[in-house]
Amino acid sequence: VPENVDLSNLLSVRALSRRLNQTLPKLDAIVLNAGLGGWTGINWPKAIWGVMTDLVHEVSWPSFKIAPAGMVTDPQTALGDDKEPRLGAVFCANVFGHYMLAHNVMPLLRHPDQLHGPGRVIWVSSLEATVKYLDVDDIQGLRTLAPYESSKALSDILALTADLPSTAPWVKSFYSVDEQPGPQEETEQEPPHPNMFLTHPGICGTGILPLSWPLFYSMLAAFWLARLLGSPWHTISTYAGACAPVWLALSAQAVLDDAEAPYRRNGGGRVKWGSSCNRLGHDQPVCTEVDGWGYGGVVGPAVLDGDRCRRRKRGAVDLTAEEKLQYEDLGRKCWQGMEELRIQWDELLDEAEAQVGSKA
């Protein structure tokens, strides 16, 4: 049965969470895929020049989209501005709404009777996620002119560092099961926490950037040309773009463990799995290089032939041990900031609901 939720409205997220907890016995996986670009326009001279002179790079990592700083959501509660802090619109739609939803349905994800082992939290990121756009002191991206890229870089960091010892206190808090109303079954031991994965759909032809019909089909033509020129990321169709997320959601845990094994054997960790396709459109999930994390967190050059042969972002360099330590420390700070923000907003929502109840 389909459900509707506004991820920019935390009360809507809370309401959906309650419905799911009351009507479903468990969740094997939750795919966190919704996006708000926040763009207000295109720098057309820059776009035309970039596509004409540097097609593959510009339609993979575009530099011509325009976004304002300081976009915020509508008020979440009736508590007033003196009690309710600002909440970044792109941050809430792309990260925080998902984050709150996943925490709220943790009883379903931690159900002991799971088909493929522990439940799965699958973050859908973007090829455009770049750590340089993320400022941990501006975790909501209110001051940046690249709020979309900032929010997706935050998704990357949360997923890739979730199993590190340095983030464990805050990740454990996120995975905790809040007290549920009604009788609770007693269990001999705490159920296992979910596994967290990261993916992206490649470059698809969607309406996330509103364009007129002639421009939309011109965009698709540019995507096709980029694929023919060797881009591994132009899946174009949303069906092909779903390849990696669906693989993560439906594969047996042993299959996913085997896929990550070469990276872990070489000192790495979690992998960003992207939907990729060849010139003929045959899709497959592959490892994606991440700024500050490299290929699966492995220091040095890529360890798999497929990764070494795949086209890289211009300017990409092999991961160093120092960069990896910085990324892990950034993960610790981001997890701490997100958990503090979640707890703050849960308290505000509790207060708002109590206020409404007292007036009823």
Predicted features by range, described:
Residues 1-4, 15, 19, 23-28, ...:
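NAD(P)H-dependent oxidoreductase Rossmann-fold/reductase module
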Residues 1-125:
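Fungal eukaryote-biased detector of long internal structured cores
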